[in-house]
């Protein structure tokens, strides 16, 4: 596979406390783009399940374009509020909107961060939860990440600065101990959970997850 990735961005100080950044990027992928281990399903009256499976088949090229706008406003006590919006579109006819809001608040050696992220996208032109027959279309996909979906992410993070600038250890100038928790909820609007029932009675798939991270950062 080959990939070409180009991007450009501009940052502007708007006021004493407000800074904004505008970014644009385009990515082109060529080659074998689908997962050889994924399958689509199609209606099959001869199967006890009512459907059978066959391999996915994706286009061999994909070009995406995205534009993003981010603004950061600095508050008293070294706190900051950041808002971001990103629009995405590609040649597979996926269109996505992502928005997020972040608040950062230092307190002594601690820094607290809270973030909310919202993402909504349409599905790829060749995505189907189930196809009407075998080889029904030129391209076929059932990857849930290609389906229409909406996701919500809530994040909390705390960092403790145990190594202050200019008081380092040898080559290390600064060090922090970090803990974060992300709560993720994804609704797939056209992707069924085939384990939840028989054909026609399946529930739409949902993903709920908590992601914990503990790590140490050093600057040198």
Regions found by a protein language model. Give the residues of each.
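Outer-membrane beta-barrel "beta-signal"
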Residues: 156-158, 207-220
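Short loop/turn motifs that connect adjacent beta-strands in outer-membrane beta-barrel proteins
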Residues: 13, 17-19, 78, 109, ...
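Membrane-embedded beta-strands of outer-membrane beta-barrel proteins
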Residues: 6-8, 67-69, 99-101, 156, ...
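Solvent-exposed loop/turn segments connecting transmembrane beta-strands
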Residues: 59-63, 88-97, 206-209
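Transmembrane beta-strands of outer-membrane beta-barrel pores
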Residues: 24-32, 63-65, 73-75, 85-91, ...
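Outer-membrane beta-barrel translocator/channel fold
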Residues: 1-5, 9-13, 26-33, 113-161, ...
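Transmembrane beta-strands of outer-membrane beta-barrel proteins
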Residues: 20-22, 81-83, 101, 110-116, ...
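Outer-membrane beta-barrel translocator domains and adjoining extracellular loop/strand segments
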Residues: 33-41, 94-99, 125-131, 189-198
